[in-house]
């Protein structure tokens, strides 16, 4: 749902009239009328489809270049494309720095989800209460590695032990939350089935944002749960355990300065009644709004 939360943040800024949602993975195939397009978010699973069509007039804001396809998106043709549409607003420090190294005028814009307005999603005027937990353990859940027969066998051998470790940590986490003087609500940003349409995705994103707006504390390991919560004024605890891979570290660079960021061991030491409020994101929030609405 995270991609659609980012999309919803942009729609909230530009308005819902006369908008068109384009497929991020097929921007090169767009062949309709010339269209102004805000290009933000994670790029991309299909780098062979980059750069976009000439009929797309891009505004880059909150753009993330994923390290797994970095070589493809930094080829000469792509660099010329970035150069012709400078400056490039980057969601993270990593993306900004890699583009600057290539001579592209780039700046750190932060993420569009930091602009989300709580008032747009509160169903009632009652005071927000309770803790919302979204995917706090998503990164710790053991999985099987299907990349090769050897890796699959190795992951199968390790799986039972990782599963036991995961279950024990989850049990301790749940017991800790039960002892808190808060009502606890739990949700998941990962859908059980693929999202079939943009309308469905936006509906799910809206419902998730409404759930976030009702609470006062967020506990998560999902960046697009943490940032909207921050924007809405919630106190945020971000569990970074399991996010050691370079892909995760790069996409989080700069963003984790916005909230209380801990590993699981340190989480149990936190007083959830006394989490500091953070406002480091606000300077970038204003710049995003000004850039999109200019």
PLM regions: where:
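Active-site anion-handling motifs in enzyme catalytic cores
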Residues: 1-294
